[in-house]
Each structure stands twice: as C-alpha cells, then as structure tokens.
Regions:
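Charged, often Cys/His-bearing segments associated with DNA-binding zinc-finger transcription factors
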Residues: 1-57, 451-475, 538-549
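Non-catalytic DNA-binding core/recognition domains of DNA-processing enzymes
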Residues: 83, 105-106
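Basic, short loop/linker segments at the boundary and entry of helix-turn-helix/winged-helix-like folds
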Residues: 43-86, 463, 467
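Alpha-helical support elements that line or immediately flank enzyme active sites
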Residues: 85-95
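N-terminal core-binding DNA-recognition domain of tyrosine recombinases/integrases
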Residues: 72, 95-97
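Short, basic interhelical loop/turn and adjoining N-cap
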Residues: 108-126
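Anion-binding and metal-coordination hotspots
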Residues: 2, 97-100, 105, 119, ...
Length: 549
C-alpha cells in the first residue's frame, strides 16, 4: 500500500507503473539535430547560457538518487530524471510555468541543448511530467522523512562551488520571510470560512444532510452578505449566530464526516479560536490562554504561521540560507525551509547537528539572532567557529571576559587578578556561579570598580556565569579589525533574499510547507547557476576582503 503513494502515476483513472532507467543520451550522436545548425548558429549556441548548463549542471545531476521513486518491476521506463531536474531549474531561471516549459523545450533549441535532448526523436516532457515527479518526491518525503530534491540541489551547489574554486571554509548565514499566498482574515472571517468550506463539502456529498438554515453557507455571495453588508454594531450578534451554527454542524458531522479535510480544519479552528463555558461557546481570550503563533491563519494554507518581525506582520514561512564565500564570488550551499515561527537559532542548531565534523577549521558568520552559548559550543564540536556580528540581550561588563571557568561552566577557577575563589556554588536553575573571595583580595584589588563585588566583613561575593563570560569575550573581539572585516563580509548575504524576491518571484510560491520548500530549492539552484554563468563569462565583480586571503 505504501508503494502506491510514489510508485504509481494516475492518469484518466488508470494506474501507470513506471520503472527507473538512467538517461543514455549523454553524448551527441551522428543524427543529432545540433549537426544541422550552421557554423554561425553553433557558435552563438556555445556562447549562450545553454553551453554552461549542458557542460556543468546537467552531468552533475545524480539520477540514481531518485530510483526509489519508481517501480522495480519491468514496466514502461520513466522520463529521464536529469532532464526533469534540469527542466525544474530552467523553469525558475526564466519564470516559466509547467506548460510553458514543455512547449519551449519543443521549440527552443537552447533548452534542448542544455538538457541533452537534441538527439531525441520526441522531446520527453509531457504536460504532467513535472507535476508527477514533484508528487513522487512529496510522497517519498512524507513516508521516509527524506527530501531527495533538497539533497540534489545541495549536491549541485557543492559542484558549482568547486567549479568557482570556493572552498567553503568561510560561510555566512541569513534568514528571510516568505509570505504565503493567503488573505489576512479576521477571527470572524476565519470561523465563517471554515464553516462554509465544511457546509459546501457536506452539500456536495449529500445535499439532504445539510439543514435548510445552513444552506446559505454554500452560496458564494453569502460571505460578503454576512461579513461586510451589515452594520458593524451587529458584529456581536453575527458572531453568536456563527458559533451557534458551528455547534450545529459539529453535531451533524460527528458520525460521517470526520475523515474529511474540511472537518479537520473546522474542528481545529473551533478548538483554537473558541472555548465552551457553561455550555455556551464564545471566542477565546488572552486570559483563557492558548493564543500562539501556531494558530491557523487561513484554511487555504493551514500550515502557515504568524510572526511579527521588525514591526511587520508575516503569515507564512521562513527560509534560512547558508552561503559559502570566496575570492571568486559566493554560492548558496545549503538552505532550510520551515514555518515562520521557527527561530534563526533553531535553524543554526539543526544545521550544525546534521553537519559532519569539518576536517579544516570553518567559519560561519551570522547576525545576533543566531548567537548563544549552546550554538557556539555545538559549532566548536564540529570544528566550526561561530562569529556573530551583533548580539541580542543584555550587555556584559568587559571584565567578565578575564574570569576563568572550568569547561562545564560550573566553577570559577580564577578572577582577573589571578585569585582562586574561597568558595563557589553553582545554581543549576539560573546557570550562574555564586563566588566568594577573601575580603582583602577584593578590597585592595585594582579591578574592584569593574567587578563591583559585594564586600562584607570577611568575604566579597560576586554572581556571574560562563554565558556572560563568553558574551564579554565576543564583545571584546568585536572591536578588533579582523572582526570588523568579518562583519563587512557577512553584510553581503543580505543581498540574497532581495535577489530571490526580485528575480525569482516568491509571490508565485505554492501554498504549503512541503510544496513551498520544493519550489524554493529550484529557485536556489537557478540562483546558483546564474552565479556560475557570470563567473564563467567573467561578468562578476567581487569586492575583496582581507579575511578571504
């Protein structure tokens, strides 16, 4: 049963099995249509983007990775996977739709040349080829929690970085908000929409099951009548009626419609937006608790979440980008995609956890949102130096950088003056150390004005932590010239989000986390190819930085 999800393609209610076969059309044959071009046409073709794509990108696509998506039985062979993946990248490069990509492959010789299909009697893409391939990838990821397309894009990025002689020893990181293509709904609109979708579904399945007083929800014009074409003073009464109708629907659907998506969204909406008090349903308030950013924003995209950042409201997703930098430019070598309430710090932790330990020291430059003692320690375990160009939170006194802690951070070994403490107790809950020194050590210490200990008759006490110590060290390093050069280098990654928004049309992203991530991966691959093409043609101008030397 599991194999049905990704081993079958359904067309006109007939199940079509497809077996995996590698693409044998890698070299130009004697009958290749390329031979029919004039010398002038061949020269123009070899100067175009298609030549770079055909020589560097297409051969680097690993078809075998995707063999698990197809049947191992003898059956009709699949469309060549490297042609499909190449087409998905070119589609984003020129902002084609699926249908436009299929049509242009038949008519544009540059596309055929780029995808090595000039020897094909018939171009291999049909109107459903790309969508079926995406569906196979989605189903495989759902079953096995492995994103084959993400791995493919990352491997292509690594190949491009190698061609551009970018070692990956210096990387920079930034995140970007991606808006879901949904309307901002008020709470009343959200409840109405969920009721309406369920009512339409019930009416379609069995018209007699929906009571007459609820049939108005199936009218496309009813939304405007209920929400907008009434006085604002009636809002409370309309809301009461909506909640009463919701309870009626809930009772009607308990036995028959629990397996439908519309019912699940309806129940989720009621559980998140309302509470039942003394037998009466009402809107949930802050005092009731349970109000959070994961609440459904619109049933058209139930995975989209809410986040407020830099004074702006966002509904949708967020992407995290890691860009490797070198003298010859930069390449996005990894990307992550999640709901927009996923923090930058979480992205970094997940990225480091899946990263293998680096053979050579690697630097990752980030902004303050990625900072933290745990992140720094995790990076160190992978032979990665985490450099944050700014810090969030409370300023740490500079003198704390000169305290010496044990490796676990549970004990202060020496103060800046070199004295060992008389006693030190670790407070597990706050992760701080309460440290006592002899009275005379602190009373006559030249650092007293900076440490500011509480001096008593026999002892002097100070409370500090290894986190504050590490923070003070970072603050001190930030004033160095090398650190300033790293900060200047990190600024470049902030051009990537604007580049993707401007040139790769994020507003056309499909709804849903899984589908959005797939399309975003194609955009990253297209962006990296453009960087490679500019490098090959000598079109890139890259500001040099001393840390790249």
């Amino acid at each position: 049963m599991l194999l049905l999800l990704y081993n079958r393609a359904i067309l006109e209610k007939k199940v079509i099995f497809m077996s995996f076969k590698e693409n044998s059309y890698q070299q130009i044959s004697f009958t290749d249509s390329f031979s029919g071009l004039t010398a002038r046409e061949q020269k123009a073709l070899e100067k175009s983007w298609a030549k770079v794509f055909a020589d560097e990108i297409f051969p680097a696509i690993d078809e075998k990775r995707f063999c698990v998506l197809y049947s191992n039985k003898a059956s009709r062979p699949n469309t060549p996977v490297n042609v499909i993946v190449g087409a998905l990248i070119i589609k984003e490069l020129f902002d084609y739709s699926d249908d436009e990509m299929v049509e242009n492959l038949m008519l544009d010789f540059r596309l055929q040349y780029a995808l090595h299909t000039t020897s094909f009697e018939e171009q291999p893409l049909s109107d459903k080829t790309l969508s079926r391939f995406r569906r196979r990838c989605y189903d495989y990821e759902t079953l096995h929690n492995k994103d084959l397309y993400h791995d493919c894009v990352n491997d292509l990025s690594a190949s491009i970085a190698k061609l551009m002689r970018i070692s990956g020893k210096i990387r920079r990181m930034d995140s970007m908000m991606i808006e879901s293509n949904i309307r901002k709904l008020s709470r009343m609109e959200l409840i109405y929409t969920c009721i309406s979708k369920l009512a339409v579904s019930m009416n379609k399945a069995n018209a007699s099951a929906l009571p007459e007083d609820l049939k108005h929800y199936t009218d496309p014009n009813d939304f405007n009548r209920v929400i907008y074409h009434q006085r604002s003073t009636d809002a409370e009464e309309r809301l009461k009626q909506l909640l009463a109708d919701a309870d009626k629907l809930l009772t009607l659907c308990e036995s028959e419609y629990q397996d439908s998506t519309e019912y699940d969204l309806f129940v989720r909406c009621l559980s998140e937006q309302t509470v039942v008090e003394n037998g009466t349903r009402r809107l949930r308030t802050k005092e009731d608790g349970g109000m959070n950013s994961s609440m459904m924003q619109n049933p058209s995209d139930p995975e989209a979440t809410f986040r407020s950042k830099a004074g702006k409201e966002h509904r949708g997703y967020t992407a995290n980008l890691e860009e490797s930098v070198g003298k010859n430019g930069s390449v996005v070598t990894d990307y992550q995609y999640d709901q927009n309430n996923h923090s930058d710090s979480q992205f970094l932790q997940e990225h480091l956890e899946q990263m293998e330990k680096q053979e050579e020291r690697t630097v990752i430059i980030t902004d303050g949102a990625y900072s933290g003692t745990e992140n720094t320690q995790l990076a160190s375990e992978k032979n990665v130096e985490l450099i944050t160009t700014s810090l969030t939170g409370k300023f740490a006194p500079d003198i704390l950088a000169d305290f010496e802690f044990n490796e676990e951070g549970t004990k202060v070994l020496r103060c800046p003056a070199g004295y060992a403490p008389k006693s030190c107790s670790y407070m597990k809950q706050s992760r701080q150390c309460a440290v006592s020194f002899l009275h005379e050590q602190c009373a006559n210490c030249p650092y007293q004005d900076q440490c500011k200990p509480k001096i008593f008759k026999r002892v002097a006490k100070i409370v500090t932590s290894k986190a504050a110590h590490e923070r003070a060290k970072i603050q001190r390093d930030m004033s160095s010239e090398e650190y300033k050069n790293y900060a200047r280098l990190r600024n470049g990654v902030e051009t990537v989000p604007s580049n993707i928004r401007r040139n790769y049309h994020l507003e056309k992203m499909p709804r849903g986390k899984q589908r959005g991530k797939f399309f975003f991966g194609s955009k990253i691959a297209a962006l990296n190819f453009r960087k490679l093409f500019n490098y090959v043609k000598g079109l890139g101008n890259y500001a040099q930085n001393p840390v790249l030397a």
